[in-house]
């Protein structure tokens, strides 16, 4: 029998020695997430990212992050069924500057509107804003009983549904095509587009619960820091993006009157 050292015993050092535990959070930094100036509450939260190490830069890891925030948190409001997606486009110091990336209705709101004895009408359209953002807007509306109606059901005829859908697409296209992204978001916050559609379709068939239920961002123009700074209420010459904690409030309450239609 060959006499020698047992390599397996000596190799591992002290048997049962515990590995040194390193706290992963010691290598990470907190960054503030800033919403654009269209919203009342600018500081929407904090995010965690691994500190810059060698070629791996922390700010590159943050760019492209999408945050989904309830409109109630952004506007300090009670109405909480709209969710806005904000994407990080640039990092200035410890601030992540975000831009609009999409909108959605909450699942419970959508389910609460779908009922029996009424017609659900949906439409979608792809539109480009004046500053080059391509958006896909989805709209939903429901028929309602007329004032003196006795019958339980309020179903629209197929021809009426087509007319309403056409009107929905026309209004959505007009409202987005003639405005830039900032103005479109200002219309989505109180959902004035939905109110416009409801008023315009009144002569075809009375509608209720008309909402732009979803907005998708399909294409963006080339990133410009100056434009992002303007969205955050700062001039392009400014270097830091601290900004105020509050933005400008969009005043369009329930009593909002849409413009009068020339032709229906």
From Swiss-Prot:
ADP-ribosylated at Tyr-155 by PARP1 in presence of HPF1. It is found in: Cytoplasm; Nucleus; Nucleus, Nucleolus. It comes from the Eukaryota. Residues 232-264 are annotated as: Disordered. The modification ADP-ribosyltyrosine is found at residue 155. This is Small ribosomal subunit protein eS1. It holds the Pfam family Ribosomal_S3Ae. There is a cross-link at residues 34, 249 (Glycyl lysine isopeptide (Lys-Gly) (interchain with G-Cter in SUMO2)). Residues 242-255 have a biased composition (Basic and acidic residues). It comes from Macaca fascicularis (Crab-eating macaque). The keyword Ubl conjugation applies. GO terms for cellular component: cytosolic small ribosomal subunit; nucleolus; ribonucleoprotein complex; small-subunit processome. One of its GO terms (biological process) is ribosomal small subunit biogenesis. Component of the small ribosomal subunit. The ribosome is a large ribonucleoprotein complex responsible for the synthesis of proteins in the cell. Part of the small subunit (SSU) processome, first precursor of the small eukaryotic ribosomal subunit. During the assembly of the SSU processome in the nucleolus, many ribosome biogenesis factors, an RNA chaperone and ribosomal proteins associate with the nascent pre-rRNA and work in concert to generate RNA folding, modifications, rearrangements and cleavage as well as targeted degradation of pre-ribosomal RNA by the RNA exosome. The keyword Glycosyltransferase does not apply. Keywords: Acetylation, ADP-ribosylation, Cytoplasm, Differentiation, Isopeptide bond, Nucleus, Phosphoprotein, Ribonucleoprotein, Ribosomal protein, Ubl conjugation.
